[in-house]
Amino acid sequence: MASVRNLWRYKKLYSFPYPIGGANVSASPQSVPVELTKYAQEDFFNRLVVRVFGNIIIAGSGSGTATGRDNPEGLLIQAQLQTSPQVTGVTPVNRLSARGLLYENMITRGYLLKASTVPDTAGTVAVDWHYIFNFSRSRTRKRVEYTFAIQKFTSALLTLTFGSREQLFSGGTNTWDVSGLSVEIYADSAFAVQADQIHSHELFEQNYPILSTQSDFPIDTLPSGYLYTDMLFLAEDNNVLSSAVIQNFDLEGGGRVWLASGDNNAAIVQEDFTQELLETGQTVTGIYAPVSILRNGMFTQAIDALTAPITVKLSVTGPGLGHVFNVRLVGRRMVPGAVQKAAPKTPAPVKKTA
C-alpha cells in the first residue's frame, strides 16, 4: 500500500551569517537576496519566519540616544518579496519595515510578539527574535486560498536589508559587533492543496510625513484595480507610537462611505475596532485598524476599488517644536483568483427519457 504524502511541513529553507561584520559605531545597510524557488518547489506557504539569533558584543562607555525604532527588530530596515511572473502588478511583500511586519503580525495573532530591548551599554547580549510573513489569513473563510503557491512562479526573490547600531541609537561612541548573529528562514507549508482558487495579494507599506494640522490629509497613493482587505495605520512621534497624531479617518469611494469625515472617530477605531482584534491587555497606543478582513473572514466585504479608486483622508494634528510626526500605512490588497482561477464546473449530463 502506497503511503500518503505529508500534507504539511515546517522546514528551514536557508540560513546565512548576519551581513555586517566588525565593531562599528554605525555601518552601511547590507542587503541579502534569497531565491526561494531554489529551496521550495511544491509548497503553498502559509507563512515565512525569519529568525535572527546569536550574540551582540557592545564595547565602550559612550551610550547613544534611542532612535525610537523597535529594538532590536528595527535592525531590519526593509523586506521585499518579488515574483516572476508578476501577477496583476502585485509584489507579495512590498517594502515592509520591521515595524510594519511586527504590528501586522500583532493584528494577525492577536498579541504582540516582541523581543527584549538591547541596551547601548558594554557587554555581550544574547538575542533571538523573529519576523513573520503571513500569507494564509487566519480567521478567514477558505484561508488556503491566500497561501503563496510557489510553483506558480519561476522566481520568488526575498530581499532582506539589515543595519546595525545606527538603526537603534544615535550619537554616542559605543561600538556594536553584530557578526555573531545568524539568520534563518523557515517555511510553514501545505502540500497537495485542493483550492478552488488562489488569490493574488500584496502586503505593502507606505509612509506619510505629517507637517501641519490638516482636516483632510490625503492618502492618495492607493491605485484602483484591487480589493483593499486590510489597512493598519501606525502613528509616530519621533519614531515612537503615539495617539496624538490622528483624530479621524474618512474612507469613501464610488458613492460609498465606510468611515465618514467629521466624526472624530480615531479614538473609537482604536478602542473598539482595533481592540476587538486583539487579546485582552494589548497596548494600542498609536495603532489603528479601521479595515480588517479578520472581522468577517470574507474578501467580499473588503473595500472595493476594482473599478473605481477610493479616497482616504485623515484629520491630523501637526507636530510641535522638536517633534517629527509620521503615519505609516501597512495594508493588504488583492485580486481574487488571479494566481489560480477556479475551474469551470462541468454541467451534469442530461438524462434521456425513453
Locate predicted features.
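Beta-strand-centric surfaces of beta-sandwich/beta-rich domains
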Residues: 1-354
